[in-house]
From Swiss-Prot:
SUPFAM superfamilies: dsRNA-binding domain-like, Ribosomal protein S5 domain 2-like
Role description: With S4 and S12 plays an important role in translational accuracy.
Keyword Protein transport: no
The protein's name: Small ribosomal subunit protein uS5c
Keywords: Chloroplast, Plastid, Ribonucleoprotein, Ribosomal protein, RNA-binding, rRNA-binding
Top-level taxon in the UniProt lineage: Eukaryota
One MF term in the entry's GO annotations: rRNA binding
GO biological process, one term: translation
Xref: Pfam families: Ribosomal_S5, Ribosomal_S5_C
Keyword Iron: no
Length: 169
C-alpha cells in the first residue's frame, strides 16, 4: 500500500516539470571511414516555481538525444530566489563563452522581456516580471548557459546578512 502512494507522489512530481526543446542540430564527426552523423539536443526544463535546468544530449537519433538532454538537465538544476512580485532580487550578469546575458528585475505587470533561450529559461523558472538582454553571441546553448550562470549568482537579503555575520535588527 505504501509503495502505491509513493509512486503516485513521484508521478505528481514528474508532471510538474515542463520541458522545452531549444535546438536539435545534426552534427558530424569525421572518422576513418567517412562522416558519422549524430544529433545534439538542447533542452530547458523547469517547474515554474524557482527551479530550472539546462541539458545537452547527443545520440544517433533525435529521441535518444532528447532523453539524454532531459537527464542532463535534471542533474544541473538550479534554485532561483523569487520575490513576491515573481521577479528577481537584483541585477545580475552571466557569461558563457562569448555570450553575455544581463538580467534586471522590472515593474509588476511588465512581463518577460527577453529573447531566445533566455526567455525560455526565465519563463520555465516562473519569473513573470523581468528584463533581459543577450550580448556577444547568438548561440542558443551559450546564451542558455550564460542565463543559468547569471541566475546562480542571485542572492537574497538574508543570505547576504548571513555571509556578513549580521543580524536583521
Amino acid at each position: 500500500m505504501l509503495n502505491a502512494k509513493k509512486s503516485n507522489k513521484t508521478k505528481e512530481k514528474e508532471t510538474d516539470w515542463q520541458e522545452r526543446v531549444i535546438q536539435v542540430r545534426r552534427v558530424t564527426k569525421v572518422v576513418k571511414g567517412g562522416k558519422k552523423l549524430s544529433f545534439r539536443a538542447i533542452i530547458i526544463l523547469g517547474n515554474e516555481r524557482g527551479q530550472v535546468g539546462v541539458g545537452v544530449g547527443k545520440a544517433s537519433d533525435v529521441i535518444g538525444a532528447v532523453k539524454k538532454a532531459v537527464t542532463d538537465g535534471r542533474k544541473n538544476l538550479i534554485n532561483i530566489p523569487l520575490t513576491n512580485q515573481n521577479s528577481i532580487p537584483h541585477i545580475v550578469q552571466g557569461y558563457s563563452g562569448a555570450a553575455k546575458v544581463i538580467i534586471k528585475p522590472s515593474a509588476p505587470g511588465s512581463g518577460v522581456i527577453a529573447g531566445g533561450s533566455v526567455r525560455t529559461i526565465l519563463e520555465l523558472a516562473g519569473i513573470k516580471n523581468i528584463l533581459a538582454k543577450q550580448l556577444g553571441s547568438s548561440n542558443p546553448l551559450n546564451n542558455a548557459r550564460a542565463a543559468a550562470n547569471a541566475l546562480i549568482n542571485l542572492r537574497t537579503y538574508t543570505s547576504v546578512l548571513n555571509d556578513r555575520n549580521l543580524d536583521l535588527h
